Amino acid sequence: MGVLDGKALPIIEIAPLSGFYDYKNKYQAGSTIETCPADLSPEKTAEMQKYAETAFRALRLKNYARMDFMMGKAGDIYCLEANTLPGMTPTSLLPQEAAAVGISYEQLCEKLIEVSLRERDR
């Protein structure tokens, strides 16, 4: 999920229609179902968002990033990686997550510039 200015965005669930989420499933149109916000309980959503924000701070990240997680069948959450340069096309995951809370692509780009300039001026 994306973290923008230290605050987690909604979770996006990625479910490949077959196999694993590999290169083919990531880039071939129609190979995955992306659901945002993810169909999780409010408690599990809050837990995962807290982990994303905590990892963001622990890694001393700035401005924005996308934190990738997997959830096991029992609901265990595993942090896979911090992506410090996530895709930023209009259909990339971070813009989809922002759109889920009413932030347009244009507004997201403006927000990224705003937080970057604020960080630079510190």
Where are these predicted regions, by residue range?
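Electropositive phosphate-/nucleotide-binding environments in soluble metabolic enzymes
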Residues: 42-49, 88, 99-106
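Active-site anion/phosphate-binding pocket segments in diverse small-molecule metabolic enzymes
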Residues: 10, 51, 55-58, 62
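Generic C-terminus detector
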Residues: 93-95, 99-122
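Phosphate-binding site of ATP-dependent enzymes
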Residues: 1-50, 71-78
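Short amphipathic alpha-helical segments
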Residues: 49, 53, 109-110
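Conserved metal-phosphate-binding beta-hairpin within the catalytic cores
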Residues: 1-3, 57-88, 98
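A short, polar/charged loop-to-alpha-helix boundary motif
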Residues: 19-25, 89-97
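Peripheral (often C-terminal) accessory segments that flank ATP-dependent C-N-forming ligase machineries
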Residues: 43, 58-61, 71-73, 111-122
